[in-house]
């Protein structure tokens, strides 16, 4: 399993090699029923569970894709991870989530 961290280093480990920048991207459509429910909650207040679940799913998929790409590069970890969100489409019906970081090889510090 590839370790993922937002920090520039991993406690207890030394970075031995920088493999390069790695990304994971997910573009997801939001369905009509979630839109309707979110619109009603926007009018009356409250949280949109449908959107929140879609956001979590997309974020987890982007991180998993980034981990797979890092593993293919021979990395043990991804450091300095950043996650970005963007709403796309003429009707703002698409959500793009991008996870990026630096793929590295690490060794346990003595």
From Swiss-Prot:
Gene3D superfamilies: Hypothetical protein apc22750. Chain B. Pfam families: YbjQ_1 (PF01906). Transmembrane segments: none annotated. InterPro entries: UPF0145_dom_sf, UPF0145_YbjQ-like. NCBIfam families: PRK01119.1. Belongs to the UPF0145 family. PANTHER family: UPF0145 PROTEIN YBJQ. This is UPF0145 protein BL0562. It comes from Bifidobacterium longum (strain NCC 2705).
């Amino acid at each position: 399993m590839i370790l993922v961290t937002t920090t520039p280093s991993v406690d207890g480990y030394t970075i031995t090699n920088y493999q390069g920048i790695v990304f994971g991207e997910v573009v997801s459509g939001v369905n009509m029923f979630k839109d309707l429910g979110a619109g009603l909650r926007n009018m009356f207040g409250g949280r949109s569970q449908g959107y929140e679940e879609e956001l979590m799913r997309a974020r987890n998929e982007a991180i998993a894709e980034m981990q797979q790409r890092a593993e293919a590069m021979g990395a043990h970890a991804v450091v300095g991870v950043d996650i970005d969100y963007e709403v796309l489409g003429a009707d703002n019906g698409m959500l793009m989530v991008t996870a990026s970081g630096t793929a590295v090889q690490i060794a346990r510090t003595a």
